[in-house]
Design a protein with these regions (language model features):
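Short, solvent-exposed recognition patches
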Residues: 1-51, 81-173
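Surface-exposed amphipathic alpha-helical segments
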Residues: 51-84, 171-204
Length: 204
């Protein structure tokens, strides 16, 4: 079961009413929303704060869908612009997990028979080389690339499976985009440019 709460507030705050030693405790940004996620084996809560209102969705035992994905559906219903999947995408799933010390928020979707995963994480590391948050090994071919003004690394193989990672230094955000098959270098670059919305707006 789920419980949804809301509170007018001057700052982000925990309104879940739940207290535990959580296995996962993550925070990240999605557009203008500050998001907090605390979970153990799928039970826990996710909160989002828009500068005026704190929302919180909590899940108990037996919740019938992943908590993060359910919360993103509610955010969209409430009118928040958090949908990063392109038009025509299907099987869209939102998730969050700790990875190499960072809180990685991801959106997986299927488009034209290819399964894509787009991820983002905030980092305090500003020097190169930047962190790879894809969770995937390098493929047969690895090259330097660029997404807008951001340094990028692209890696792929003959089947079209691959990944591209990039770093936007001003807001301190690292990104990754991966494809399971039939994509290749050009498709990875095209999709990355299509999905990437700079946190600071267009620059230069």
């Amino acid at each position: 079961s789920y419980t949804l709460r809301a509170l007018k507030s001057g700052e982000s705050t925990d309104i879940s009413g739940l207290y535990a030693d959580w296995a996962e405790a993550l925070e990240w940004q999605s557009g203008q929303l500050s998001i907090q996620y605390n979970s153990t084996d799928g039970t826990g809560w996710i909160g989002w704060y828009d500068g005026e209102t704190q929302w919180c969705l909590s899940a108990g035992d037996g919740a019938d869908a992943p908590l993060v994905n359910t919360a993103y559906s509610i955010m969209q219903t409430l009118g928040y612009d958090v949908d990063v999947a392109p038009e025509g995408a299907s099987d869209v799933v939102y998730s969050a997990e700790p990875r190499d010390g960072l809180a990685v928020a991801s959106c997986a979707f299927t488009l034209d028979g290819v399964r894509w995963t787009y991820s983002m994480a905030a980092t305090s590391q500003v020097e190169l080389p930047f962190q790879d948050i894809s969770g995937l090994p390098d493929y047969a071919v690895t090259e330097d690339a660029q997404i807008l003004w951001c340094p990028a690394v692209i890696s792929y193989d003959e089947s079209g499976a691959g990944k591209i990672t990039w770093f936007d230094v001003a807001p301190g955000l690292v990104y990754s985009l991966s494809a399971d098959n039939s994509a290749g270098r050009d498709a990875l670059l095209d999709m990355a440019n299509r999905l990437f919305t700079p946190a600071q707006g267009e620059v230069g």
